[in-house]
């Protein structure tokens, strides 16, 4: 392999503690002339269980050291909240839980690499997935001078058995089992599930797929209401508790909503999506807190933004969903779209009540000092602010283009009848 002959002195590996990245450490040292391997692990809220013993595992696999970087608060505050303001939902369903975590992980990865003086970075993404593109696009934007190593595009190993044998031959301990049914990825926003029976789109997900939320059928029979308070587009309170930067903070707010939503089976989706690399894939996602937050935020938008502003913000959200999914966070386009969404969010101050019940998160109350809703205008009864006779002129002008088209093309119903 020509690429493997390139001189690399020090490489920083994005390390999870799993089978793949545990095998990558000795592979790097063997294929890149005994280079020093430093492990980097990003804590984006995947849970203590996932991070338990990760430093020890990395050292046991051959890494010289392991950096575990706590990114939880920054992730929610600087990535999730700005994306929330765009209203981005990929292909109408997916709340982008995996995609939105990649930019901050890539940034922290590069920061560690520059700190230790590495000349390369390495990831464990497969050659079929989206993440290889997302990470490497971010690397290119942040540190184009660094070499990127992607073992799954180089080595000959193709199965979990191959990886386990590789580690066993080198007497490297690994607790991974030969049979792993599902591939999962978790962070503060969500958890994703792929593989196993999910590879057949006609197969219903088993109960074992879902690990974060209660089955909606088993959720409480009594609904629960959650009140969210926003200030200039930022979540600052839930049920009267301060979650602003002066209070418990953004990460704790999301954890609170995750707990509430999970108990009521909120946030489950089972979708087939179009991958960036061209193929379709099926995934099951659990985003309980995010589903509540998105419902509340959009509920506030409908109360405050005028029609044309909301229409434009929705167009930004549609385009930005692809920007995030494709890994283009560190681009001028992303910066412009985030700024646009943030400008609309400045008006979004108010309270929203969301009812949680057996998988449903429904907005049932909303109020704001910036509300454009006027009961006087909206009523169907008599009022002093809107003369219904004025509608006739509006309708005539609104339908003028249709009238002209019909007259010029003889396309009216009368002409057709004749």
UniProtKB/Swiss-Prot annotation:
Gene Ontology BP terms: argininosuccinate metabolic process; L-arginine biosynthetic process; urea cycle
Reaction catalysed by this enzyme: L-citrulline + L-aspartate + ATP = 2-(N(omega)-L-arginino)succinate + AMP + diphosphate + H(+)
Family in the record: Belongs to the argininosuccinate synthase family. Type 1 subfamily.
Top-rank taxon, per record: Bacteria
Pathway: Amino-acid biosynthesis; L-arginine biosynthesis; L-arginine from L-ornithine and carbamoyl phosphate: step 2/3
Source organism: Colwellia psychrerythraea (strain 34H / ATCC BAA-681)
Gene3D superfamilies: Argininosuccinate synthetase, chain A, domain 2, HUPs, Single helix bin
EC number: 6.3.4.5
UniProt-recorded name of the protein: Argininosuccinate synthase
Family annotation (InterPro entries): Arginosuc_syn_C, Arginosuc_syn_N, Arginosuc_synth, Arginosuc_synth_CS, Arginosuc_synth_type_1_subfam, AS_cat/multimer_dom_body, Rossmann-like_a/b/a_fold
Subunit text: Homotetramer.
